[in-house]
C-alpha cells in the first residue's frame, strides 16, 4: 500500500496553521466546486501550499492568488492569505495583499503606541 506523502505533509501544515491562528481546517477543501481555503478563522481564509521535498525557492502563481480571493469572497471572507513553505516541515510564510498589510501595520503601530 503506497501512501501519498504530499497529502500527509499538507494535512500537517494545515493543522499547524489552524492551531497557530485559532482557526479550523476545511475538510476536502479542494474537492468541491465552491469550496476552498485550507484553513478558516473568524476573519481569514488561508490557502496552504508546500513542496514535497526541500526547495531553495518557491514560485507563487498569480492564478493561485486570484482563485483564493474569488473563493474567499464567495464564502464571505474579506481577508485572505496564501501560506507556503520551502520544505515540507519548515516555517510557514504568508502572502497578503496591500490592504491587509496596511491593516496589519496600523494595528501593530496602534498597539505599540507608535
Language-model segments: residues:
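Catalytic phosphate/metal-binding cores of nucleic-acid and nucleotide-processing enzymes, i.e., regions
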Residues: 1-114
